[in-house]
Amino acid sequence: SEVTTPAGSGPRHFIFNRKGDVVYCATEYANTVIAYKLDQESGTLTPFQTISMLPESFKEKSTAADIHITSNNKFLYASNRGHNSIVGYTINEKTGELKLIGYFPTGKNPRSFNIDPAGNYLIAAGEISNDLTSYRINRDTGELTVVQNIPTGNQPSWVLIGEY
């Protein structure tokens, strides 16, 4: 089936929750996450929530980049280029609705990030600051704490963490 998003919003990445009944879309230009219920029989998507990825007070240019869910299906994170942050949300286990945890500073232009398979760490690439930052994920609250910042070569643009 065809999925439409608001004109000009720029759907960038879609990710399924671990149960496969909710799909989340990061919109690059609107800086929102749109949550859709997935009808597993028909394959249709029905939007049920749109939530901003930016603080209300932020008025500068920013674009969404990446989106991931922890392996325990409790937390969703998305990256903001311009605001230079990772936004975190809790995922309601029953409804799939998102609730804001907070905004966590990153290097400049966090184009890509990923979460380790155990759901303990998030690693973000600062494409303009030329660095990787690792964060510990609080398993109870979803808050991110910086563990280490590592300089890289020019413009790191993808973070992939293999299974172990």
Predicted regions span which residues?
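Beta-propeller fold detector
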Residues: 1-3, 44-53, 98-105, 144-152
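Beta-rich, blade/repeat-based domains predominating
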Residues: 5-21, 53-73, 106-121, 152-164
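Conserved beta-strand positions in repeat-built beta-propeller and related beta-rich domains
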Residues: 17, 25-28, 78-81, 124-127
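Oxyanion-binding "anion nests"
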Residues: 26-37, 45-76
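Structural signal for beta-propeller blades
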Residues: 31-33, 84-86, 131-132
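Short loop/turn segments immediately following beta-strands, especially the blade-tip
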Residues: 36-44, 89-96, 135-142
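C-terminal structural cap/anchor segments
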Residues: 65, 69-109
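Blade-level signature of beta-propeller repeat domains, shared across WD40, Kelch, NHL, RCC1
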Residues: 127-136, 145-164
